[in-house]
């Protein structure tokens, strides 16, 4: 096994509570022991920890509603309690922890993304275990990542991680729902995430948590495209974290793509929300996917939404399937003026020469 790997471990609410409404501190100790064993082997460990709402509910010792405001209040109460528990448990092994609370806004902006990356790397360089959660107490719908599965994928990209372990209450990804079908079998390895797999994943979650298997599959797809191997496994399994680093691999393993993206394209994959969409024709799709070409106006059929030059947009086909993401060199109104036009016509159509490419190949990433 390669030493000095960066391992992101995502612990869902169901793992930390054991399916109850309280944190299972005995199991948390066991998870900490395994993380510290990885550190002894020379690896860096990052925890993406759910459980703030559950900790807040336990701390208040009274019933609370389940509205957004109630959950944000519980997160505000519970986040301090949660980090205190992690700090106490890691201290048993002489390991320091550091807290980072993130929102989508921290990765939308390139400068903030780089600052978050530098802070994360500094914690690892000082042999500190970062404990990361979304800033649920203040995050609004516009800046929320939405679930810690996708947050952990973004963290794995930030940290340039080798592995992402998504620990849950399920053994992994099955051929059908094992809770309703006794004949369901575990899928041991996945090399490509397609529509059939997405259907298998469904969309279940727990009352205390926000993530089901569908969000884990989405997170796995993001991370593997950035060159991160992903494993979905049952968090209650004996030595599950250590086994994920051995040949006794539990759960479902998602193979990383053979060519990890460079830093700028990782950011395009991980961070910003798309401001709009550009629809392209079959010829443009072929040029992007087989020739590594830039997107020219001639291959564009429509621009959807309102976006400005420099915004991140999604590139889709006529069936609304996602083809790529990238930084546009024209606004939505300009794209609709030049769509279908030859490059030499752009200056005349816009009264200025903005260049031939709607998206330059250096500013886009294929999906």
UniProtKB/Swiss-Prot annotation:
- What positions does the domain PUA occupy? 275-353
**Positions annotated to bind ATP:** 10, 168-169, 210-216
What GO CC terms are in its UniProt record?
cytosol
A GO term, aspect molecular function: RNA binding
> The organism sits in which domain of life?
Bacteria
Q: In which pathway does it act?
A: Amino-acid biosynthesis; L-proline biosynthesis; L-glutamate 5-semialdehyde from L-glutamate: step 1/2
Listed under catalytic activity are: L-glutamate + ATP = L-glutamyl 5-phosphate + ADP
Q: Which UniProt keywords apply?
A: Amino-acid biosynthesis, ATP-binding, Cytoplasm, Kinase, Nucleotide-binding, Proline biosynthesis, Transferase
Q: Where does substrate bind?
A: 50, 136, 148
**GO BP of this protein:** L-proline biosynthetic process
Instruction: Extract the coiled-coil ranges from the record.
Output: none
EC number assigned by the record: 2.7.2.11
State the similarity comment. Belongs to the glutamate 5-kinase family.
This protein's name: Glutamate 5-kinase 2
Q: Name the encoding gene, please.
A: proB2
């Amino acid at each position: 096994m390669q030493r000095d790997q960066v391992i992101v471990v995502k612990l869902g609410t169901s793992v930390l509570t054991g399916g109850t409404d309280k944190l299972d501190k005995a199991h948390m100790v066991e998870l900490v022991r395994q993380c510290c064993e990885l550190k002894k082997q020379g690896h860096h460990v990052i925890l993406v920890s759910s459980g703030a709402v559950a900790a807040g509910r336990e701390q208040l010792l009274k019933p609370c509603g389940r509205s957004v405001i109630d959950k944000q209040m519980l997160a505000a109460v519970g986040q301090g309690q949660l980090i205190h528990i992690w700090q106490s448990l890691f201290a048993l092994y002489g390991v320091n922890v550091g807290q980072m609370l993130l929102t989508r806004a921290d990765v939308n902006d390139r400068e903030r993304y780089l600052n978050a990356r530098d802070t994360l790397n500094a914690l690892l360089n000082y042999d500190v275990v970062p404990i990361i959660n979304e800033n649920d107490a203040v995050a609004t719908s516009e800046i929320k990542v939405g679930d810690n599965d996708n947050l952990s994928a973004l963290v794995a990209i930030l940290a340039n991680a080798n592995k992402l372990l998504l620990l849950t209450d399920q053994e992994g990804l099955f051929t059908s729902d094992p809770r309703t079908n006794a004949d369901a079998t575990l899928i041991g390895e996945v090399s490509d995430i397609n529509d059939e797999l997405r259907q298998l994943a469904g969309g279940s979650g727990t009352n205390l948590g926000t993530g089901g298997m569908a969000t884990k599959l989405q997170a796995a797809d993001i991370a593997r495209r950035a060159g991160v191997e992903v494993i979905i496994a049952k968090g209650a399994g004996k030595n599950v974290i250590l086994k994920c680093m051995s040949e006794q691999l539990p759960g479902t393993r998602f193979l990383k793509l053979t060519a990890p993206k460079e830093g700028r394209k990782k950011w395009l994959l991980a961070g910003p929300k798309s401001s709009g969409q550009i629809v392209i024709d079959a010829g443009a799709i072929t040029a992007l996917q087989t020739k590594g070409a830039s997107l020219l106006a001639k291959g564009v059929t429509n621009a959807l939404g309102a976006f400005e030059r420099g915004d991140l947009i999604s590139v889709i086909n006529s069936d609304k399937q996602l083809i790529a993401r990238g930084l546009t060199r024209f606004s939505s109104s300009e794209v609709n003026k030049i769509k279908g036009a030859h490059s030499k016509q752009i200056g005349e159509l816009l009264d200025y020469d903005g260049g031939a490419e709607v998206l330059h190949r250096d500013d886009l990433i294929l999906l």
